[in-house]
Amino acid sequence: MTLLNRGFFILLSYFFIDGNINGKENRLHTFSHPCMGTIFKVSVHSEKSRNKVEDIVQGSFKIADEMDDRFSDYSAESEVSKFNKQESHIPFRISSELLELLTISQSLYHKTSASFEPAAGALTQLWRLSRKTKRLPDQKTLSLAIKASSFASLIIDRKNKTLTKKNHLTRLDFGGIAKGYTADKMLNYLQEHDLKSCSISAGGDVIVGNPPPGRLYWIIRINPFGDSNSETMRVKLSNAAVSTSGNVEQFIQIGGKKYSHIVNPKNGLGLTTNHAAVVISNKGSMSDALATSISILGKSGLKILDHFPNTEAAIIDLNDNKVTKSPNFNKFSK
């Protein structure tokens, strides 16, 4: 099945959420907040006053900032950065949030055959340098980073809430799950404060609660080109999440070869295959992490969905412009 023209890319800022309804009493309120290197956008349908809605939404943005303070590997003062500086074989005390994210990540690591690798910080740091210098890492440095980039190099003590690295080069990088996990937290907060009909978008991740009044679902349009004339993929969701991942939007060319910003933890280099993925799941953490994993694995990545109930995916092969979907993906198509 061919859906998209040649040259397709996912421009993550071009997610649109349709949820407008007529009527003065139940209004749509939208708020934005910069965090985690992107813009978190919250849309809410509510009969409450805008001031009351804004107070609640600001509380959800505070959660996003708190998660960024814990999980960012760009901030030297974050919890993750402090762990990354820790020497090997010395237990590091961790927060409940980091322990929870590690637990989720550990399950994903095993179920995705390690294509989701949150302990690949040494590789992502090395690849950031390569993107800056436009030179591939030397083989010795790359080999050491690959060896260190494994969840198996971590020891999690859940009782005492500590994390220990076996290899001093091991680094955490939650770039493939942090936004989705944070959006889950924000959604829970909003719904606990009686804002049931809401949506949160953050880069390539969108998570929604109850549909707008009078609707059965939210309609989310994924625009590949970022202009009104291009073809879109539309999905319908209620209390679910959708994430995208693609390697065409950001790439570098080294030695005449194109490399993605997405790192394959198996070889430590950016992807060279033209794949883009769309994943729908019941949690933002799941859709976020699996979108990256399936981008790395390609069409074979759809097989890992056997381990994830209530999850569907579509992968676009940009070499032949074809879309391969999991068996029940079309039930979300609009």
Question: What is the predicted role of each segment?
Answer:
Residues T2-K334:
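Mature catalytic core of soluble alpha/beta enzymes
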